[in-house]
Every structure is written in C-alpha cells, then in structure tokens.
Amino acid sequence: NLFQFGEMIFEKTGKEAVHSYAIYGCYCGWGGQGRAMDATDRCCFVHDCCYGRVNGCNPKMATYSTSFQNGDIVCGDNDLCLRAVCECDRAAAICLGQNVNTYNKNYEHYSISHCMEESEQC
C-alpha cells in the first residue's frame, strides 16, 4: 500500500515520500501524463506501468509482507498479487534511490499542466 511504499522510499532515499515524491514531475504521485522530466520521474513512470500490469488487486491499498534486511527490501508474500505489488514498489524505491543525486527540487509540486507532450506507452 502507499504507506508501505513510502517506507521503502525513505529506506532507499532518506527522503520523506509525501513531501519529496507525491507531486514530482509528470508521473510521481496520483496519475501521470506527458513525458518523464528526469530519471526520478522516469522511476515513477515505470512504477505506474508496473501497477498497470498487476491484475486482480488494488495496488495502492493492498497490504503486503515486507522487511528490510541488510539494506535490501525483501517482499515475502506467497499471494501472487500481493507479491507483484510489493515488487513494483520495491523496484521503484530502488530506482528512486539510485537517482537521488539527480533529484531536482524544481520538479517538486510540479503542475501537471506542464506535462502536455504525448505520453509514452508502457
């Protein structure tokens, strides 16, 4: 769920998810359109695509089993749907962590009205 995803983001970036990523670029946060603004925003685009491939559950609300071990995020569900959601969140958190050095404060609270280019396909 979004709370667990936020914990993963904090674990990998040291940033508080809601403040730093809830309205970042064209894809971080609810929905998305246009072209990703940078590598961080691209992580969110890929995450949106991943959620789009998860069928049969509500990825934003699904509560899954996860733990943090030696700096890694471990998804522990046997339920295929919950595990898929966890893996989407895990991959995005890792991606955000790998791109934290290029995080651009100019894209915080970015207006979706600036995201008018044709959207990429997943």
From Swiss-Prot:
It catalyses: a 1,2-diacyl-sn-glycero-3-phosphocholine + H2O = a 1-acyl-sn-glycero-3-phosphocholine + a fatty acid + H(+). The keyword Metal-binding applies. Signal peptide: none annotated. InterPro entries: PLipase_A2, PLipase_A2_Asp_AS, PLipase_A2_dom, PLipase_A2_dom_sf, PLipase_A2_His_AS. Keywords: Disulfide bond, Hydrolase, Metal-binding, Neurotoxin, Presynaptic neurotoxin, Secreted, Toxin. It is found in: Secreted. GO terms for molecular function: calcium ion binding; calcium-dependent phospholipase A2 activity; phospholipid binding; toxin activity. Disulfide bonds join C26-C115, C28-C44, C43-C95, C49-C122, C50-C88, C57-C81, C75-C86. The active site is at H47, D89. SUPFAM superfamilies: Phospholipase A2, PLA2. Its cofactor is Ca(2+). SMART domains: PA2c (SM00085). Heterodimer of an acidic subunit (CbIalpha or CbIbeta) and a basic subunit (CbII). The acidic subunit is non-toxic, and increases the toxicity of the basic subunit. This is Acidic phospholipase A2 CbIalpha. It comes from Pseudocerastes fieldi.
